[in-house]
Amino acid sequence: MKTRTEKDTFGPIEVPEQHLWGAQTQRSLHFFAISTEKMPVPLVAAMARLKRAAAKVNAELGELDPQVADAIMRAADEVVAGKWPDEFPLSVWQTGSGTQSNMNMNEVLANRASELLGGERGEGRKVHPNDHVNRGQSSNDTFPTAMHVAAAVEVEHRVLPALKALRGTLAAKSAAFYDIVKIGRTHLQDATPLTLGQEISGYVAQLDLAEQQIRATLAGLHQLAIGGTAVGTGLNAHPQFSAKVSAELAHDTGSAFVSAPNKFQALASHEALLFAHGALKTLAAGLMKIANDVRWLASGPRSGLGEISIPENEPGSSIMPGKVNPTQCEAVTMLAAQVMGNDVAINVGGASGNFELNVFKPLVIHNFLQSVRLLADGMVSFDKHCAAGIEPNRERITELVERSLMLVTALNPHIGYDKAAQIAKKAHKENLSLKEAALALGHLTEAQFAEWVVPGDMTNARR
Protein backbone atom coordinates (compact mmCIF):
# COMPACT_ATOMS: atom_id res chain seq x y z
CA MET A 1 0.00 0.00 0.00
CA LYS A 2 1.36 3.38 -1.01
CA THR A 3 1.58 5.90 1.83
CA ARG A 4 2.48 9.51 2.50
CA THR A 5 3.86 11.08 5.66
CA GLU A 6 1.55 13.25 7.75
CA LYS A 7 2.55 15.05 10.95
CA ASP A 8 0.84 16.25 14.10
CA THR A 9 2.22 17.35 17.47
CA PHE A 10 3.17 13.74 18.24
CA GLY A 11 5.34 13.54 15.16
CA PRO A 12 5.19 11.83 11.75
CA ILE A 13 2.93 8.92 10.83
CA GLU A 14 2.26 7.09 7.59
CA VAL A 15 -1.18 7.52 6.04
CA PRO A 16 -2.60 5.62 3.03
CA GLU A 17 -1.94 7.79 0.00
CA GLN A 18 -5.42 7.33 -1.44
CA HIS A 19 -7.13 8.81 1.62
CA LEU A 20 -7.66 12.46 2.52
CA TRP A 21 -7.40 12.09 6.27
CA GLY A 22 -4.31 12.99 8.24
CA ALA A 23 -2.24 12.08 11.26
CA GLN A 24 -4.81 12.31 14.03
CA THR A 25 -7.35 10.23 12.13
CA GLN A 26 -4.69 7.59 11.49
CA ARG A 27 -3.79 7.47 15.18
CA SER A 28 -7.45 7.09 16.11
CA LEU A 29 -7.82 4.15 13.72
CA HIS A 30 -4.88 2.50 15.47
CA PHE A 31 -5.93 3.13 19.05
CA PHE A 32 -9.71 2.72 18.73
CA ALA A 33 -10.23 -0.37 16.60
CA ILE A 34 -13.38 -1.08 18.60
CA SER A 35 -16.49 -2.78 17.23
CA THR A 36 -18.12 -1.87 13.91
CA GLU A 37 -20.14 1.24 14.74
CA LYS A 38 -18.87 4.26 12.80
CA MET A 39 -19.82 7.88 13.23
CA PRO A 40 -23.33 8.25 11.77
CA VAL A 41 -23.57 9.69 8.26
CA PRO A 42 -25.98 12.48 9.34
CA LEU A 43 -23.45 13.60 11.95
CA VAL A 44 -20.65 13.67 9.36
CA ALA A 45 -22.86 15.76 7.07
CA ALA A 46 -23.76 18.10 9.92
CA MET A 47 -20.09 18.56 10.79
CA ALA A 48 -19.30 19.38 7.16
CA ARG A 49 -22.13 21.92 7.08
CA LEU A 50 -20.74 23.47 10.24
CA LYS A 51 -17.22 23.73 8.81
CA ARG A 52 -18.62 25.32 5.67
CA ALA A 53 -20.54 27.88 7.71
CA ALA A 54 -17.50 28.58 9.90
CA ALA A 55 -15.24 29.15 6.89
CA LYS A 56 -17.73 31.54 5.31
CA VAL A 57 -18.23 33.52 8.52
CA ASN A 58 -14.51 33.64 9.31
CA ALA A 59 -13.88 35.10 5.86
CA GLU A 60 -16.62 37.69 6.33
CA LEU A 61 -15.15 38.67 9.70
CA GLY A 62 -11.63 39.00 8.29
CA GLU A 63 -10.40 35.95 10.18
CA LEU A 64 -9.65 33.81 7.12
CA ASP A 65 -8.31 34.41 3.62
CA PRO A 66 -11.32 34.40 1.24
CA GLN A 67 -9.62 32.01 -1.19
CA VAL A 68 -8.87 29.53 1.57
CA ALA A 69 -12.40 29.88 2.91
CA ASP A 70 -13.85 29.28 -0.54
CA ALA A 71 -11.80 26.11 -0.96
CA ILE A 72 -12.91 24.82 2.46
CA MET A 73 -16.53 25.56 1.57
CA ARG A 74 -16.24 23.71 -1.73
CA ALA A 75 -14.63 20.73 -0.02
CA ALA A 76 -17.37 20.73 2.63
CA ASP A 77 -20.04 20.81 -0.06
CA GLU A 78 -18.51 17.68 -1.56
CA VAL A 79 -18.71 15.91 1.80
CA VAL A 80 -22.34 16.92 2.29
CA ALA A 81 -23.11 15.63 -1.20
CA GLY A 82 -21.67 12.25 -0.22
CA LYS A 83 -18.60 12.37 -2.43
CA TRP A 84 -16.14 11.11 0.20
CA PRO A 85 -17.95 8.43 2.26
CA ASP A 86 -14.80 6.38 2.90
CA GLU A 87 -12.90 9.28 4.46
CA PHE A 88 -14.75 9.13 7.79
CA PRO A 89 -13.90 5.69 9.20
CA LEU A 90 -13.65 6.42 12.91
CA SER A 91 -15.39 4.39 15.57
CA VAL A 92 -18.12 5.80 17.78
CA TRP A 93 -16.11 4.37 20.67
CA GLN A 94 -13.41 7.03 20.87
CA THR A 95 -12.79 10.12 22.94
CA GLY A 96 -16.00 11.25 24.62
CA SER A 97 -15.72 14.77 23.25
CA GLY A 98 -15.66 13.63 19.63
CA THR A 99 -12.29 15.35 19.15
CA GLN A 100 -10.97 12.69 16.79
CA SER A 101 -13.99 12.99 14.53
CA ASN A 102 -13.70 16.76 14.54
CA MET A 103 -10.06 16.41 13.50
CA ASN A 104 -11.00 13.76 10.94
CA MET A 105 -13.23 16.37 9.29
CA ASN A 106 -10.62 19.10 9.67
CA GLU A 107 -7.94 16.95 8.03
CA VAL A 108 -10.12 15.77 5.15
CA LEU A 109 -11.30 19.29 4.37
CA ALA A 110 -7.78 20.72 4.67
CA ASN A 111 -6.28 18.20 2.26
CA ARG A 112 -9.17 18.45 -0.19
CA ALA A 113 -9.24 22.26 -0.04
CA SER A 114 -5.49 22.28 -0.68
CA GLU A 115 -6.04 20.17 -3.79
CA LEU A 116 -8.77 22.54 -4.96
CA LEU A 117 -6.26 25.39 -4.60
CA GLY A 118 -3.74 23.50 -6.74
CA GLY A 119 -1.73 22.22 -3.80
CA GLU A 120 -1.07 18.78 -2.40
CA ARG A 121 -1.98 16.63 0.56
CA GLY A 122 0.11 16.34 3.68
CA GLU A 123 2.99 18.54 4.76
CA GLY A 124 2.97 20.74 1.68
CA ARG A 125 -0.75 21.53 1.80
CA LYS A 126 -1.98 25.11 1.53
CA VAL A 127 -4.78 24.69 4.08
CA HIS A 128 -4.14 23.76 7.71
CA PRO A 129 -6.65 21.58 9.60
CA ASN A 130 -6.37 23.56 12.85
CA ASP A 131 -5.39 27.07 11.80
CA HIS A 132 -7.84 27.32 8.90
CA VAL A 133 -10.61 24.70 9.01
CA ASN A 134 -10.90 24.76 12.82
CA ARG A 135 -10.44 28.54 13.08
CA GLY A 136 -12.26 29.97 16.12
CA GLN A 137 -13.44 26.53 17.13
CA SER A 138 -12.84 23.67 19.54
CA SER A 139 -14.00 20.08 19.35
CA ASN A 140 -15.86 20.92 22.55
CA ASP A 141 -18.23 23.28 20.74
CA THR A 142 -18.16 21.90 17.19
CA PHE A 143 -19.14 18.35 18.10
CA PRO A 144 -22.18 19.28 20.22
CA THR A 145 -23.19 21.75 17.52
CA ALA A 146 -23.05 19.00 14.90
CA MET A 147 -25.01 16.76 17.28
CA HIS A 148 -27.85 19.27 17.46
CA VAL A 149 -27.80 20.00 13.73
CA ALA A 150 -27.91 16.30 12.85
CA ALA A 151 -30.61 15.54 15.42
CA ALA A 152 -32.88 18.42 14.42
CA VAL A 153 -32.53 17.89 10.68
CA GLU A 154 -33.15 14.15 10.93
CA VAL A 155 -36.17 14.57 13.18
CA GLU A 156 -37.65 17.26 10.96
CA HIS A 157 -36.96 15.55 7.65
CA ARG A 158 -37.29 11.87 8.58
CA VAL A 159 -39.38 11.22 11.67
CA LEU A 160 -42.08 13.86 11.32
CA PRO A 161 -42.92 13.15 7.65
CA ALA A 162 -43.08 9.40 8.31
CA LEU A 163 -45.25 9.97 11.36
CA LYS A 164 -47.59 12.25 9.42
CA ALA A 165 -47.98 9.70 6.62
CA LEU A 166 -48.80 6.83 9.00
CA ARG A 167 -51.20 9.05 10.89
CA GLY A 168 -52.99 9.87 7.63
CA THR A 169 -53.34 6.21 6.72
CA LEU A 170 -54.79 5.29 10.10
CA ALA A 171 -57.11 8.31 10.09
CA ALA A 172 -58.51 7.17 6.75
CA LYS A 173 -59.04 3.66 8.12
CA SER A 174 -60.76 5.08 11.19
CA ALA A 175 -63.19 7.03 9.04
CA ALA A 176 -63.84 4.08 6.73
CA PHE A 177 -64.55 1.68 9.59
CA TYR A 178 -66.40 4.05 11.91
CA ASP A 179 -69.74 2.22 11.71
CA ILE A 180 -68.40 -1.31 12.24
CA VAL A 181 -69.46 -2.31 15.75
CA LYS A 182 -67.04 -4.67 17.48
CA ILE A 183 -66.42 -5.93 20.96
CA GLY A 184 -64.05 -3.98 23.14
CA ARG A 185 -61.43 -5.60 25.33
CA THR A 186 -59.87 -4.59 28.63
CA HIS A 187 -57.40 -6.76 30.57
CA LEU A 188 -57.47 -9.03 27.47
CA GLN A 189 -61.07 -9.86 28.43
CA ASP A 190 -64.35 -8.98 26.71
CA ALA A 191 -65.66 -5.49 27.43
CA THR A 192 -68.44 -3.29 26.08
CA PRO A 193 -68.70 -2.55 22.35
CA LEU A 194 -67.11 0.22 20.35
CA THR A 195 -66.58 0.63 16.64
CA LEU A 196 -63.48 -0.40 14.77
CA GLY A 197 -63.16 3.20 13.67
CA GLN A 198 -63.24 4.39 17.27
CA GLU A 199 -60.56 1.90 18.20
CA ILE A 200 -58.29 3.08 15.39
CA SER A 201 -59.03 6.72 16.26
CA GLY A 202 -57.20 6.04 19.51
CA TYR A 203 -54.12 5.13 17.51
CA VAL A 204 -54.44 8.35 15.51
CA ALA A 205 -54.65 10.37 18.72
CA GLN A 206 -51.53 8.63 20.04
CA LEU A 207 -49.62 9.69 16.95
CA ASP A 208 -50.98 13.24 17.20
CA LEU A 209 -49.74 13.49 20.78
CA ALA A 210 -46.37 12.06 19.80
CA GLU A 211 -46.01 14.65 17.05
CA GLN A 212 -46.90 17.48 19.42
CA GLN A 213 -44.36 16.28 21.96
CA ILE A 214 -41.60 15.88 19.36
CA ARG A 215 -42.23 19.34 17.93
CA ALA A 216 -42.04 20.78 21.44
CA THR A 217 -38.45 19.54 21.72
CA LEU A 218 -37.16 21.19 18.55
CA ALA A 219 -36.56 24.61 20.12
CA GLY A 220 -33.93 23.07 22.39
CA LEU A 221 -32.24 21.22 19.53
CA HIS A 222 -32.09 24.47 17.57
CA GLN A 223 -29.80 26.06 20.18
CA LEU A 224 -26.17 25.61 19.13
CA ALA A 225 -22.98 25.44 21.20
CA ILE A 226 -20.73 26.93 18.50
CA GLY A 227 -18.76 29.89 19.79
CA GLY A 228 -18.20 28.40 23.22
CA THR A 229 -14.81 26.98 22.12
CA ALA A 230 -12.99 25.04 24.86
CA VAL A 231 -14.98 25.61 28.06
CA GLY A 232 -17.79 27.99 27.09
CA THR A 233 -15.97 31.32 27.35
CA GLY A 234 -15.54 31.78 23.60
CA LEU A 235 -11.75 32.07 23.80
CA ASN A 236 -10.17 32.60 20.33
CA ALA A 237 -13.53 33.03 18.59
CA HIS A 238 -14.65 36.36 17.10
CA PRO A 239 -17.45 37.93 19.21
CA GLN A 240 -19.86 37.71 16.27
CA PHE A 241 -18.81 34.21 15.23
CA SER A 242 -21.43 32.25 17.17
CA ALA A 243 -24.47 34.20 16.04
CA LYS A 244 -23.34 34.40 12.43
CA VAL A 245 -22.49 30.69 12.14
CA SER A 246 -25.83 29.75 13.69
CA ALA A 247 -27.64 32.00 11.22
CA GLU A 248 -25.69 30.50 8.32
CA LEU A 249 -26.62 26.98 9.43
CA ALA A 250 -30.26 28.03 9.69
CA HIS A 251 -30.12 29.37 6.13
CA ASP A 252 -28.33 26.26 4.87
CA THR A 253 -30.69 23.71 6.42
CA GLY A 254 -34.00 25.53 6.72
CA SER A 255 -34.07 24.79 10.46
CA ALA A 256 -34.40 27.59 13.01
CA PHE A 257 -30.91 27.35 14.50
CA VAL A 258 -29.75 30.03 16.93
CA SER A 259 -26.78 30.56 19.21
CA ALA A 260 -27.30 28.90 22.60
CA PRO A 261 -27.75 31.55 25.31
CA ASN A 262 -25.40 29.80 27.74
CA LYS A 263 -22.39 28.07 26.20
CA PHE A 264 -21.26 26.55 29.50
CA GLN A 265 -24.43 24.47 29.62
CA ALA A 266 -24.25 23.73 25.90
CA LEU A 267 -20.83 22.09 26.28
CA ALA A 268 -21.27 20.44 29.67
CA SER A 269 -24.70 18.82 29.32
CA HIS A 270 -27.20 17.53 26.79
CA GLU A 271 -30.65 18.16 28.21
CA ALA A 272 -32.09 19.10 24.82
CA LEU A 273 -31.11 15.75 23.33
CA LEU A 274 -32.40 13.86 26.37
CA PHE A 275 -35.70 15.74 26.18
CA ALA A 276 -36.01 15.13 22.45
CA HIS A 277 -35.20 11.46 22.74
CA GLY A 278 -37.75 11.15 25.51
CA ALA A 279 -40.36 12.24 22.98
CA LEU A 280 -39.01 9.71 20.48
CA LYS A 281 -39.26 7.04 23.17
CA THR A 282 -42.89 8.03 23.74
CA LEU A 283 -43.53 7.62 20.02
CA ALA A 284 -41.87 4.20 20.20
CA ALA A 285 -44.16 3.19 23.06
CA GLY A 286 -47.19 4.25 21.05
CA LEU A 287 -46.03 2.36 17.98
CA MET A 288 -45.45 -0.76 20.07
CA LYS A 289 -49.01 -0.57 21.36
CA ILE A 290 -50.45 -0.01 17.89
CA ALA A 291 -48.43 -2.82 16.32
CA ASN A 292 -49.32 -5.22 19.12
CA ASP A 293 -53.02 -4.41 18.78
CA VAL A 294 -52.93 -4.91 15.02
CA ARG A 295 -51.26 -8.31 15.23
CA TRP A 296 -53.66 -9.46 17.95
CA LEU A 297 -56.69 -8.29 15.99
CA ALA A 298 -55.33 -10.08 12.91
CA SER A 299 -54.42 -13.27 14.78
CA GLY A 300 -55.57 -16.52 13.26
CA PRO A 301 -56.48 -17.13 10.54
CA ARG A 302 -58.84 -19.71 12.10
CA SER A 303 -57.95 -19.95 15.78
CA GLY A 304 -57.37 -16.34 16.75
CA LEU A 305 -59.36 -13.12 17.06
CA GLY A 306 -59.38 -12.61 13.31
CA GLU A 307 -61.28 -9.32 13.38
CA ILE A 308 -59.08 -7.73 10.75
CA SER A 309 -56.92 -8.92 7.87
CA ILE A 310 -53.50 -7.49 7.10
CA PRO A 311 -51.39 -7.92 3.96
CA GLU A 312 -49.71 -11.28 3.43
CA ASN A 313 -46.22 -10.26 2.39
CA GLU A 314 -44.03 -13.35 2.57
CA PRO A 315 -43.95 -16.99 3.74
CA GLY A 316 -43.85 -17.20 7.51
CA SER A 317 -42.40 -20.59 8.31
CA SER A 318 -39.68 -22.90 7.09
CA ILE A 319 -41.62 -25.94 8.32
CA MET A 320 -45.34 -25.06 8.30
CA PRO A 321 -46.58 -24.68 4.71
CA GLY A 322 -48.92 -21.78 4.06
CA LYS A 323 -48.19 -19.99 7.33
CA VAL A 324 -48.08 -16.18 7.13
CA ASN A 325 -46.98 -14.01 10.04
CA PRO A 326 -47.54 -10.36 11.08
CA THR A 327 -43.93 -9.52 10.31
CA GLN A 328 -44.33 -5.76 9.96
CA CYS A 329 -45.87 -5.62 13.43
CA GLU A 330 -43.01 -7.68 14.82
CA ALA A 331 -40.42 -5.40 13.25
CA VAL A 332 -42.09 -2.35 14.79
CA THR A 333 -42.22 -3.90 18.26
CA MET A 334 -38.54 -4.82 18.06
CA LEU A 335 -37.40 -1.40 16.91
CA ALA A 336 -39.55 0.21 19.59
CA ALA A 337 -37.76 -1.90 22.19
CA GLN A 338 -34.41 -0.80 20.76
CA VAL A 339 -35.42 2.86 21.00
CA MET A 340 -36.38 2.34 24.64
CA GLY A 341 -32.98 0.78 25.27
CA ASN A 342 -31.29 3.67 23.48
CA ASP A 343 -33.11 6.03 25.82
CA VAL A 344 -31.50 4.39 28.82
CA ALA A 345 -28.04 4.74 27.28
CA ILE A 346 -28.69 8.37 26.37
CA ASN A 347 -29.90 9.12 29.89
CA VAL A 348 -26.75 7.60 31.39
CA GLY A 349 -24.61 9.56 28.94
CA GLY A 350 -26.47 12.78 29.63
CA ALA A 351 -26.06 12.38 33.38
CA SER A 352 -22.33 11.72 33.14
CA GLY A 353 -20.85 15.13 32.42
CA ASN A 354 -18.09 16.50 34.62
CA PHE A 355 -17.38 20.17 35.18
CA GLU A 356 -17.16 22.00 31.83
CA LEU A 357 -17.65 19.10 29.42
CA ASN A 358 -19.82 16.07 28.91
CA VAL A 359 -17.64 13.30 27.50
CA PHE A 360 -20.34 10.85 26.39
CA LYS A 361 -21.14 12.80 23.25
CA PRO A 362 -20.53 10.07 20.62
CA LEU A 363 -22.63 7.60 22.62
CA VAL A 364 -25.50 10.07 22.92
CA ILE A 365 -25.66 11.02 19.25
CA HIS A 366 -25.04 7.47 18.00
CA ASN A 367 -28.04 6.18 19.92
CA PHE A 368 -30.17 9.22 19.13
CA LEU A 369 -29.64 8.95 15.39
CA GLN A 370 -30.17 5.19 15.45
CA SER A 371 -33.54 5.79 17.10
CA VAL A 372 -34.44 8.38 14.48
CA ARG A 373 -33.59 6.03 11.64
CA LEU A 374 -35.40 3.07 13.21
CA LEU A 375 -38.55 5.05 13.90
CA ALA A 376 -38.66 6.75 10.52
CA ASP A 377 -37.90 3.66 8.46
CA GLY A 378 -40.14 1.53 10.65
CA MET A 379 -43.14 3.83 10.25
CA VAL A 380 -42.66 4.03 6.48
CA SER A 381 -42.47 0.24 6.23
CA PHE A 382 -45.40 -0.39 8.58
CA ASP A 383 -47.52 2.18 6.76
CA LYS A 384 -46.79 0.82 3.28
CA HIS A 385 -46.76 -2.90 3.97
CA CYS A 386 -49.31 -3.25 6.78
CA ALA A 387 -51.48 -0.30 7.82
CA ALA A 388 -52.52 0.59 4.28
CA GLY A 389 -53.86 -2.93 3.79
CA ILE A 390 -55.89 -3.34 6.98
CA GLU A 391 -59.39 -4.62 6.21
CA PRO A 392 -62.21 -5.66 8.56
CA ASN A 393 -63.56 -9.21 8.71
CA ARG A 394 -67.18 -8.20 9.22
CA GLU A 395 -68.66 -11.67 9.76
CA ARG A 396 -66.11 -12.51 12.44
CA ILE A 397 -66.59 -9.15 14.13
CA THR A 398 -70.37 -9.62 14.23
CA GLU A 399 -70.02 -13.18 15.53
CA LEU A 400 -67.86 -12.06 18.45
CA VAL A 401 -70.16 -9.16 19.31
CA GLU A 402 -73.20 -11.43 19.44
CA ARG A 403 -71.39 -13.96 21.65
CA SER A 404 -70.07 -11.41 24.11
CA LEU A 405 -71.44 -11.47 27.65
CA MET A 406 -70.48 -7.85 28.26
CA LEU A 407 -73.46 -6.59 26.28
CA VAL A 408 -75.26 -7.18 29.56
CA THR A 409 -73.81 -3.83 30.72
CA ALA A 410 -76.60 -2.11 28.76
CA LEU A 411 -79.09 -3.56 31.25
CA ASN A 412 -77.54 -1.89 34.32
CA PRO A 413 -79.73 1.25 34.19
CA HIS A 414 -82.89 -0.83 33.79
CA ILE A 415 -82.55 -3.81 36.16
CA GLY A 416 -79.46 -2.96 38.22
CA TYR A 417 -75.92 -4.29 38.42
CA ASP A 418 -76.70 -7.38 40.52
CA LYS A 419 -79.43 -8.77 38.28
CA ALA A 420 -77.36 -8.02 35.18
CA ALA A 421 -74.46 -9.95 36.73
CA GLN A 422 -76.77 -12.91 37.40
CA ILE A 423 -77.71 -12.98 33.72
CA ALA A 424 -74.07 -12.89 32.58
CA LYS A 425 -73.00 -15.61 34.99
CA LYS A 426 -75.89 -17.91 34.08
CA ALA A 427 -75.22 -17.43 30.36
CA HIS A 428 -71.53 -18.20 30.82
CA LYS A 429 -72.05 -21.22 33.10
CA GLU A 430 -74.78 -22.85 31.03
CA ASN A 431 -73.49 -21.76 27.60
CA LEU A 432 -76.62 -19.73 26.89
CA SER A 433 -77.06 -16.50 25.05
CA LEU A 434 -77.64 -13.40 27.17
CA LYS A 435 -81.20 -13.26 25.92
CA GLU A 436 -81.86 -16.86 26.86
CA ALA A 437 -80.41 -16.36 30.33
CA ALA A 438 -82.33 -13.13 30.90
CA LEU A 439 -85.65 -14.68 29.95
CA ALA A 440 -84.96 -17.80 32.03
CA LEU A 441 -84.33 -15.68 35.11
CA GLY A 442 -87.43 -13.60 34.44
CA HIS A 443 -85.64 -10.29 34.87
CA LEU A 444 -87.07 -8.77 31.66
CA THR A 445 -89.19 -9.54 28.64
CA GLU A 446 -88.07 -10.40 25.13
CA ALA A 447 -89.25 -6.99 23.91
CA GLN A 448 -87.32 -5.21 26.64
CA PHE A 449 -84.16 -7.13 25.79
CA ALA A 450 -84.50 -6.19 22.12
CA GLU A 451 -85.02 -2.54 23.04
CA TRP A 452 -82.27 -2.23 25.63
CA VAL A 453 -79.47 -4.43 24.27
CA VAL A 454 -78.45 -2.77 21.00
CA PRO A 455 -74.67 -2.99 20.48
CA GLY A 456 -74.53 -0.03 18.12
CA ASP A 457 -76.26 2.22 20.65
CA MET A 458 -73.67 1.28 23.25
CA THR A 459 -70.82 2.82 21.23
CA ASN A 460 -72.07 6.43 21.16
CA ALA A 461 -70.94 6.44 17.54
CA ARG A 462 -74.45 7.12 16.26
CA ARG A 463 -75.26 10.00 18.59
UniProtKB/Swiss-Prot annotation:
Question: What is the enzyme's main class?
Answer: lyase
Q: Name one GO molecular function term.
A: fumarate hydratase activity
Query: Could you tell me the EC number(s) of this protein?
Result: 4.2.1.2
Q: Which GO terms describe its biological process?
A: fumarate metabolic process; malate metabolic process; tricarboxylic acid cycle
The miscellaneous comment for this protein is: There are 2 substrate-binding sites: the catalytic A site, and the non-catalytic B site that may play a role in the transfer of substrate or product between the active site and the solvent. Alternatively, the B site may bind allosteric effectors.
Which positions bind substrate? 97-99, 125, 128-131, 138-140, 186, 318, 323-325
- Basic and acidic residues compositional bias: what residue ranges? 121-134
Keyword Lyase in record:
yes
Q: Which GO terms describe its cellular component?
A: cytoplasm
Q: What does this protein do?
A: Involved in the TCA cycle. Catalyzes the stereospecific interconversion of fumarate to L-malate.
Q: Which NCBIfam families match?
A: fumC_II, PRK12273.1
Q: Where is this site: Important for catalytic activity?
A: 330
Q: Which UniProt keywords apply?
A: Cytoplasm, Lyase, Tricarboxylic acid cycle
The family assignment reads: Belongs to the class-II fumarase/aspartase family. Fumarase subfamily.
Spell out the subunit comment.
Homotetramer.
Descriptive protein name = Fumarate hydratase class II
Which HAMAP family does its entry note? Answer: FumaraseC
Q: Which domain of life does this protein belong to?
A: Bacteria
Where does the record place the catalytic residues? 187 (proton donor/acceptor), 317
Sequence segments annotated as region (Disordered): 121-142
- Subcellular compartments: Cytoplasm
Biochemical pathway: Carbohydrate metabolism; tricarboxylic acid cycle; (S)-malate from fumarate: step 1/1
Q: Which InterPro entries match?
A: Fum_hydII (IPR005677), Fumarase/histidase_N (IPR024083), Fumarase_C_C (IPR018951), Fumarate_lyase_CS (IPR020557), Fumarate_lyase_fam (IPR000362), Fumarate_lyase_N (IPR022761), L-Aspartase-like (IPR008948)
Signal sequence, start to end: none
